[in-house]
Amino acid sequence: MSRLPSLSSLCLAIACSALLGGCVAAGDVRPFAELAPIVPVVAPVAQPTAGAIYAAGPSLNLYGDRRARDVGDLLTVNLVENTTASSTANTSISKADTVDMSTPTLLGVPLTVNGIDVLRNSTSGDRSFDGKGNTAQSNRMQGSVTVTVMQRLPNGNLVIQGQKNLRLTQGDELVQVQGIVRAADIAPDNSVPSSKVADARIAYGGRGAIAQSNAMGWLSRFFNSRLSPY
């Protein structure tokens, strides 16, 4: 009779864990972080002057380039991220100790029992440690995202922000870009590489079946967490 409550408790715990694991799998595997809100600085619209030849307002440049320079302009960011990192660590420690105690003597006569050196003793110890570790990581991202100029700083730099959301058959893919661009780095085709975006925040993630298939289950996450005894 004493085993029935414990067996029932074990079955209940397994059922609750499976239910919680199903709830986690049904949700988003990698929730997207919201972009930090940036309040655009909008320049006041100049009122037209009746009867004047010149009216202040946005200029219509017929001969210059059309690169982004004002708040609300669009700019294409070419994602050319390519990072590689590797690290190797080797540690080797060894130590050996030996202690030899010879037979003591009394007035020049060795102390023995029936001719046996019972007081003579020797000990030795040997300790060693050898550890090796290797790690390597490589990331590569290519593509393009068109962003919006949110602010124009006093020095002429542009604060940009934007995202691209792709709705695919097996889920969603989202790319977010945020940072600061120098106006001189913008190419004539109104594009800039991501390597020249200062304070860049580039996020890429997904939702759906493909993203869930690459995520560990709740039991695997437990054995890979700090709570695991193994």
From Swiss-Prot:
Lipid moiety-binding region for S-diacylglycerol cysteine? C16
Which keywords has UniProt assigned to this entry? Answer: Bacterial flagellum, Cell outer membrane, Lipoprotein, Membrane, Palmitate, Repeat, Signal
Give the residues carrying a lipid (N-palmitoyl cysteine).
Answer: C16
User: Where, subcellularly, is it found?
Assistant: Cell outer membrane; Bacterial flagellum basal body
The protein's topology relative to the membrane is: Lipid-anchor
GO terms for MF: cytoskeletal motor activity
Give a yes or no for keyword Signal in this entry.
yes
BP-aspect Gene Ontology terms: bacterial-type flagellum-dependent cell motility
Q: Which domain of life is it from?
A: Bacteria
Q: Name one GO cellular component term.
A: cell outer membrane
Which InterPro entries does UniProt cross-reference here?
Answer: Flag_Lring
Give the main location.
Answer: membrane
What NCBIfam families has UniProt attached to this entry?
PRK00249.1-4 (NF001304)
As for family, the record states: Belongs to the FlgH family.
Known role: Assembles around the rod to form the L-ring and probably protects the motor/basal body from shearing forces during rotation.
Q: How does it assemble?
A: The basal body constitutes a major portion of the flagellar organelle and consists of four rings (L,P,S, and M) mounted on a central rod.
Protein name, as recorded: Flagellar L-ring protein
- Which gene is the coding source of this polypeptide chain? flgH
